[in-house]
């Protein structure tokens, strides 16, 4: 059997990005999936992006990944969430046509060099000298490889639950990977159990659309990918409805029949995507919960009722749906269900997503305790890239918290672990002013170019974009007004004798290049996309300068090593609780210490000061 550099197990969002990244990095890569026709399937909601998640999609695209381009090709309703808030927390989101999305992913994979797609099931891993050396396939037998990326999603020992019905499955209609789960346990890998759920799918033809308020797409859709010049798909509208007292009563009367509340499910579900049963139990005082009716495609009769995830029996699902306005005569195409699956405690991984106890085995996606397409895809990208570099004898790639949301997520997972499905939010990033969705390519594409995974087309597009931005910034910085001149143009500035540039003025509230172009007509030459970038950059300039200093200080302190001989008890002012935790965990650096639960900036300062003082005293006595 042929030897591959990297074998990727699983064809979901993590697996596709992992295989694509590995192949682009020059590794001979095999992607193993149960069904090639299912590659890129959106198992749950038909949408990409959102708050925090949209940042991840842009970062994947900055590395020349798949997700952004596929979402642009399939997007049928683009919306920028948090539009009225600051640029740092705005979240690009696109509802996608499921079939078009799959087709876009498969097309990109099939034309990628160094990549072969294999339809089979991995039933075992080959371990030699305590390292991964390949996999065993159900049909084709032994497949040697230098590294393996495991992206099992909900398939690892997956079980579907609908009421009191339970059966093994990775998702509806597809088998789970039970033997692989057993094998991982045999290697002493710490596995846990999580669950997620999905709502019933409804027939579009049986919904009373005329009585429901509509949600429109943005008038000017903004693509995810730098390579997308224009969104080609027609933009559709969604409808909004709500549950009501009658709905809630039916759920309460049948709550004991829900798989979630009957004791059949052990794993915790995603906190920020609760089932309708959870909503009624935990937020029973509300008179209704909003439901978004989202078409799954332009030529598809299927509607996804976002907000109605459930594991109630089919008869109860029918009853509760018929109490909701617009759904009185609805037909269910597929029942909602919960799915429970195994995951690996991510604290067992390095920050390259390699398993410490089994070198050569990389994990990405829901197997690491995350939830969401975007989180999975971002992990797949990093794992696939590092797997390829490991086999090629190259340095590992680590992405820091101050560089990207990908770095924030990986650091959270590896340092803190998970007890419930992890979802990305902008609030998780300390340096979110710097980690905006609009500057993902500026942050990451030069790195991707150094790694050799960026196409010639993308690099040219990136350079042209940066050139336009540099020229626009320079123009704004060359145009000045005195306070008196500013007042003459109706601009409110301090009369302090300081001349201010157009760039400086853009930091003022309600200021724009459009307004300043009445003073300086040459600003009209800046194209609309570049205008937005310059305005955001200027608006945040003062804060970004301070944040850059904070990042440098953090990086300097993070690199400070904690000696193994450190006498924690001698550090005055440190709580006994933290002393105990430090002794137990034995952090090797300040970067490790700051992840300890309960650690504060003040406590870190005490540790840093103590270590530096000890070093000075040692140097004097030497």
From Swiss-Prot:
GO terms for cellular component: cytosol
Residues that coordinate or bind NAD(+): 269-283
Alphabetic keyword roster: Cytoplasm, FAD, Flavoprotein, NAD, tRNA processing
Keyword tRNA processing: yes
GO molecular function: flavin adenine dinucleotide binding
Cofactor needs: FAD
Pfam families, alphabetized: GIDA, GIDA_C_1st, SAM_GIDA_C
Quaternary structure annotation from Swiss-Prot or TrEMBL: Homodimer. Heterotetramer of two MnmE and two MnmG subunits.
PANTHER family, alphabetized: GLUCOSE INHIBITED DIVISION PROTEIN A, PROTEIN MTO1 HOMOLOG, MITOCHONDRIAL
Protein name: tRNA uridine 5-carboxymethylaminomethyl modification enzyme MnmG
Protein's gene: mnmG
């Amino acid at each position: 059997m042929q030897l591959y550099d990297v074998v990727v197990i699983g064809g979901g969002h993590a697996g596709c990005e992992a295989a694509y990244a590995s192949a682009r990095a020059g590794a001979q890569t095999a992607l193993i999936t149960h069904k090639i026709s299912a590659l890129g399937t959106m198992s749950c909601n038909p949408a990409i992006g959102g708050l925090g998640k949209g940042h991840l999609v842009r970062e994947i695209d900055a590395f020349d990944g798949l997700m952004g381009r596929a979402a642009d090709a399939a997007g049928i309703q683009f919306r920028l969430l948090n539009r009225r808030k600051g640029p740092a927390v705005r979240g690009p989101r696109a509802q996608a046509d499921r079939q078009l999305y799959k087709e876009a992913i498969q097309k990109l994979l099939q034309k990628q060099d160094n990549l072969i797609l294999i339809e089979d099931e991995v039933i075992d891993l080959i371990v030699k000298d305590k390292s991964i050396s390949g996999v065993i396939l159900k049909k084709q037998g032994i497949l040697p490889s230098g590294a393996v990326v495991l992206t099992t999603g909900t398939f690892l020992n997956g079980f579907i639950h609908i009421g009191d019905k339970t059966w093994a499955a990775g998702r509806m209609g597809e088998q789970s990977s039970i033997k692989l789960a057993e094998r991982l346990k045999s290697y002493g890998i710490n596995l846990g159990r999580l669950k997620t759920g999905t709502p019933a799918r409804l027939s579009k033809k049986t919904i009373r659309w005329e009585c429901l308020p509509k949600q429109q797409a943005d008038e000017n859709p903004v693509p995810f990918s730098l390579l997308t010049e224009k969104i080609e798909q027609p933009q559709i509208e969604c409808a909004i409805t709500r549950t009501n007292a009658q709905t809630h009563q039916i759920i309460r009367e049948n709550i004991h029949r829900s798989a979630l509340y009957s004791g059949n499910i052990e794993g915790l579900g995603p906190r920020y995507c609760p089932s309708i049963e959870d909503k009624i139990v935990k937020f029973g005082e509300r008179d209704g919960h909003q439901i978004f009716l989202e078409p799954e495609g332009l030529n598809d009769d299927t509607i996804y009722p976002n907000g109605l995830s459930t594991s109630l029996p089919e008869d109860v699902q029918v009853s509760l749906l018929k109490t909701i306005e617009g759904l009185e005569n609805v037909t269910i195409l597929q029942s909602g269900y919960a799915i429970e699956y195994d995951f690996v405690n991510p604290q067992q991984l390095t920050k390259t997503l390699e398993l410490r106890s089994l070198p050569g085995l990389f994990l990405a996606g829901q197997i690491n305790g995350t939830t969401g397409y975007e989180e999975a895809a971002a992990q797949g990208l990093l794992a696939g890239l590092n797997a390829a570099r490991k086999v090629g004898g190259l340095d590992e790639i680590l992405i820091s918290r101050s560089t990207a949301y990908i770095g924030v997520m990986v650091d959270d997972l590896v340092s803190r672990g998970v007890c419930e499905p992890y979802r990305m939010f902008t609030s998780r990033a300390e340096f979110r002013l710097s980690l905006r969705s609009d500057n993902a390519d500026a942050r990451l594409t030069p790195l991707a170019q150094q790694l050799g995974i960026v196409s010639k087309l993308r690099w040219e597009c990136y350079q042209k974009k940066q050139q336009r931005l540099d020229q626009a910034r320079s123009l704004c910085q060359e145009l000045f007004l005195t306070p008196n001149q500013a007042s003459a143009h109706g601009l409110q500035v301090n009369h302090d004798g300081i001349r201010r540039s157009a760039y400086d003025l853009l930091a003022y509230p309600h200021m724009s290049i459009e307004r300043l172009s009445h003073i300086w007509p040459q600003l009209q030459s800046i194209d609309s996309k570049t205008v937005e970038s310059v305005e955001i950059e200027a608006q945040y300039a003062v804060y970004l300068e301070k944040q850059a200093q904070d990042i440098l200080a953090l990086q300097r302190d993070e690199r400070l090593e904690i000696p193994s001989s450190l006498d924690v008890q001698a550090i005055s002012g440190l709580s006994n609780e933290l002393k105990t935790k430090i002794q137990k965990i034995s952090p090797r650096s300040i970067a490790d210490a700051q992840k300890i639960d309960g650690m504060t900036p003040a406590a870190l300062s005490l540790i840093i000061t103590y270590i530096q003082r000890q070093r000075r005293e040692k140097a004097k006595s030497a």
